[in-house]
Amino acid sequence: MGLSFTKLFSRLFAKKEMRILMVGLDAAGKTTILYKLKLGEIVTTIPTIGFNVETVEYKNISFTVWDVGGQDKIRPLWRHYFQNTQGLIFVVDSNDRDRVVEARDELHRMLNEDELRDAVLLVFANKQDLPNAMNAAEITDKLGLHSLRQRHWYIQSTCATSGEGLYEGLEWLSNNIASKA
């Protein structure tokens, strides 16, 4: 009896660890998002060549977030980060209408990789504070998210600089990764 209570207690209250890969085209706001979540403040960023990795604590979950550079020359390196990824955050610059097709192509190329078949997908429709930004419904359409029948996905409108929508996204990730465990 005591052992089963201990198991239940630890399952409810033990800190869970989740591996998250955050990718997207260059200048989408990935690094700004990472450090807004980690530090609660805006940091000055430069284009990421390589990666940043931080642990973000949220509720009783420890997210290890890998923020990988998005410049076209280094996108082939993304696949080296796929292994053991439980959640994929794909960040889109909602104001960048010229490159949304490129973003869609990169996303679908990644989702076809076998190592990501079990990862849930969270799309951050970032830069919602800009006046010409596409809303989440438009981004959903342009990224072809409705065609992802075998994938558990969600889109969240965000503004990395204000933090708006970021924790709602983590909430969705925590609920949906935990339910797959």
From Swiss-Prot:
Keyword Calcium: no
Pfam family, one: Arf
An annotated Gene Ontology molecular function: GTPase activity
Keywords: ER-Golgi transport, Golgi apparatus, GTP-binding, Lipoprotein, Myristate, Nucleotide-binding, Protein transport, Transport
Binding site for GTP: 24-31, 67-71, 126-129
Entries under CDD domains matching the protein: Arf1_5_like
Membrane spanning residue stretches: none
Lipidation (N-myristoyl glycine): 2
Compartments, record wording: Golgi apparatus
Biological process, per Gene Ontology: protein transport; vesicle-mediated transport
GO cellular component annotations of the record: Golgi apparatus
Domain of life where this protein originates: Eukaryota
Known role: GTP-binding protein involved in protein trafficking; may modulate vesicle budding and uncoating within the Golgi apparatus.
Family, similarity comment: Belongs to the small GTPase superfamily. Arf family.
Protein name: ADP-ribosylation factor
Source organism: Vigna unguiculata (Cowpea)
